[in-house]
Design a protein with these regions (language model features):
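Glycine-centered coil/turn sites that cap beta-strands in beta-rich domains
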Residues: 1-15, 19-39, 49, 61-73
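Solvent-exposed serine/threonine-rich low-complexity stretches and specific carbohydrate-binding patches
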Residues: 47-56
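C-terminal tail/sorting-segment detector
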Residues: 78, 82-104
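Extracellular Ig-like/FN3 beta-sandwich strand-entry sites
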Residues: 32, 57-59, 82-84
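Generic detection of short hydrophobic beta-strand segments and adjacent strand-loop junctions
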Residues: 52, 62-64, 98-100
């Protein structure tokens, strides 16, 4: 999704928020660099690494969760519970965190 080339890095609020099953995270990359988007629980544990790759300048979207089994209704450690989660964009010298809410 490379519509217009942005002149700065930016992390948008996810949509929808709150979400039930999936949500979309949109972000802008100002120049070619390594991009990482990580989702954490409120205890700082990594839930999922959405992106960890070099990207050209542009505007992108990524869905959370990406792992097919992450929302299964079982007792595994991978099951997401209702509540707040943080997601972080790291690109170049830019870092930004946002909060999202899961309400099943």
């Amino acid at each position: 999704m490379n519509d217009l080339v942005p002149n700065e890095f930016y992390l948008f609020q996810n949509f929808p928020n709150p979400f039930k099953e999936k949500t979309t995270i949109k972000y802008c990359v100002a120049y070619k660099t390594r991009v990482r988007i990580t989702v954490f629980n409120t205890e700082g544990e990594i839930i999922e690494m959405l992106i960890d790759e070099e990207k050209e300048a542009g505007t992108y979207k990524s869905e959370f969760p990406q792992a097919a089994n992450i929302l299964l209704e079982d007792k595994s450690d991978k099951q997401l519970k209702n509540g707040n989660y943080l997601y972080r964009l790291e690109a170049g010298n830019y870092t930004s965190d946002k909060q999202m809410i899961l309400e099943k």
